[in-house]
């Protein structure tokens, strides 16, 4: 478990040269670098090379190799283009000289324009729901080893309140849909760039697991290997990461050991603040 300040420090990577940055790693329970960390750090690196009047509106990344949590990550930024309204950057992340991730990000000046959005799903509000940890407490007596394993892997810097049972607790097949309220636990003061970096970190949770929902009975007791393959994030409107946000996720398809999921993120007033897509590997150990 890390604190909010430690997360901010993790995402605020060190600048070594104009287009070269080095980041440390969030120590995951499974020993591999968490994809959300690389998303947030790469966005931070790109932001450091962009004019201050431009805000990220989209980022598209590919996870090439699994990262080692014990090795710092080098981020190299290419300044692809600075236009009158848009700026484009490419970021490649390396460990020991090998590329583990690459991303393209686009930044845009503030402009007036037309406005519409889809409606937020009609679900219970967070004040009426338990956190996923509260849901999991029933496991303590029933299966203490599994409970400890789940808690060790849990990013307790964030609060998650699933509208239904937390995905990792489900043992029956269901539709590939999930609605999860989330926020960072501590109140923070941060500009929109840092808010976006923290959202990028958090957006990697629950997406791939949603693709497992129609298959829980088959895989819940199986040894599975999960890994994000790519991740795209669009920022539509400003938001506060320490206020409750609703992550509405669906998985339209799973095939060939890959699951595809997409999510829409709303604030409590129903404002759509971001969209996310991801494809991930869902492979059984043989």
Model-derived segments and their meaning:
Residues 1-286:
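Terminal targeting signals and extreme-terminal segments of soluble enzymes
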């Amino acid at each position: 478990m890390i604190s909010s300040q430690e997360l901010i420090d993790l995402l605020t990577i060190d600048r070594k040269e104009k287009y070269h940055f080095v980041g440390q790693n969030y120590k995951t329970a499974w020993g591999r670098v968490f994809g959300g960390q690389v998303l947030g750090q790469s966005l931070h690196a790109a932001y450091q090379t962009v004019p201050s009047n431009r805000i990220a509106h989209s980022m598209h990344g590919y996870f090439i190799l699994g990262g080692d949590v014990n090795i710092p990550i080098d981020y190299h930024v290419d300044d692809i283009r600075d236009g009158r309204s848009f700026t484009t950057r490419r970021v490649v992340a390396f460990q020991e000289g090998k590329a583990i991730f690459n991303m393209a990000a686009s930044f845009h000046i503030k402009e007036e324009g037309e406005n519409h959005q889809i409606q937020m799903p009609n679900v219970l509000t967070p004040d009426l729901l338990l956190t996923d940890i509260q849901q999991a407490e029933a496991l303590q007596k029933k299966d203490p080893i599994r409970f400890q394993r789940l808690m060790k892997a849990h990013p307790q810097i964030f609060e998650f309140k699933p509208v239904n049972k937390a995905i990792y607790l489900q043992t029956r097949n269901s539709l590939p849909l999930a609605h999860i309220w989330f926020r960072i636990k501590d109140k923070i003061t941060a500009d929109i760039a840092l808010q976006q970096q923290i959202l990028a970190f958090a957006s990697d949770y629950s997406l791939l697991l949603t693709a497992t929902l129609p298959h829980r009975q088959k895989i819940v007791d199986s040894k599975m290997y999960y890994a994000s393959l790519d991740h795209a994030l669009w920022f539509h409107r400003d938001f506060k990461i320490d206020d409750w946000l609703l992550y509405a996720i669906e998985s339209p398809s799973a095939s060939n050991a890959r699951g595809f999921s997409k999510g829409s993120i709303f604030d409590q007033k129903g404002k759509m603040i971001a969209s996310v897509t991801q494809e991930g590997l869902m492979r059984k150990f043989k």
